[in-house]
Amino acid sequence: MRWFVWLFATSLVLAPAAHAAEGVDLTLVLVTDVSRSIDDSEFKLEKDGYAAAFTSKQVIEAIQNGTIGAIAVSYVEFASSFEVRTVLDWIVIRDEASAQAFADKLVAAPRSFWGRTAISAGIDRAVQLQAESGFEAPRHVIDVCGDGTNNAGRDVTEARDDALKAGITINGLAIINDHPVSWTYAHVQPPGGLPNYYRENVTGGPSSFVLEVHDFHTFGEAMTRKLVTEIAAAAVPRSLAAAP
């Protein structure tokens, strides 16, 4: 894994060989928990929430107000340490049409896994995607979304630290499960709460944050707020960039 960190860090300063990388305001990897603690109805609400967020007026306006007016997004699903899938590779979103195309592909994709929860594996895949993206951006972000702690794969703090060394910020969206079954209680409601677990073990980097959502039905609203915050942090508004 550490060679991906080196590859990503060096690619930021060595790149321009055969052709110039495409410029965007932000490269964003969505890393989504699809482990067994999330049932099919909750999974559908997650997917619909992502679609609603990316096609919302607020998010599209935030994208278009950036210096370049475009972001690059990919989407990863994870469960156990060997259950990681890049569902959608890099897609550039710059307007309503490209946002809708991304949302349609996301909603249409079938669920990948049902295993345990290796947040570290999801982060590792996201670091790899960032290293190989081919985009040039002032900010690189991984969004981790889940309802439980890391209980498979390598230590999540190691994966987080490798991402931070590569210059990547990790943000989190902690989904609170208020009605866990007995065998998942410690997993979804760790001491101090899941948002605090994310802050201490998962997220990090400049302007990183954790957003908590208490209901899968409000996932889309939370994701919209999250995306607007991330996009706004990534770029200087065009009006300022154009000023003498």
Question: Positions of the model-derived regions?
Answer:
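Bacterial N-terminal signal peptides
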Residues: V5-A15
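Sec/Tat signal peptide C-region and signal peptidase I cleavage site
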Residues: P16-A20
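Von Willebrand factor
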Residues: E22-D89, I93, S98-C145, A174-T184, ...
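Second-shell loop/turn segments in exported
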Residues: V31-S41, V73, D89, K105-R116, ...
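Exposed acidic/Ser/Thr-rich ligand/metal-binding surfaces
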Residues: R116-A166, P244
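VWA/integrin I-like adhesion module and closely mimicked acidic/polar interface patches used
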Residues: T149-Y197
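C-terminal "exit" segments of structured domains
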Residues: V210-P244
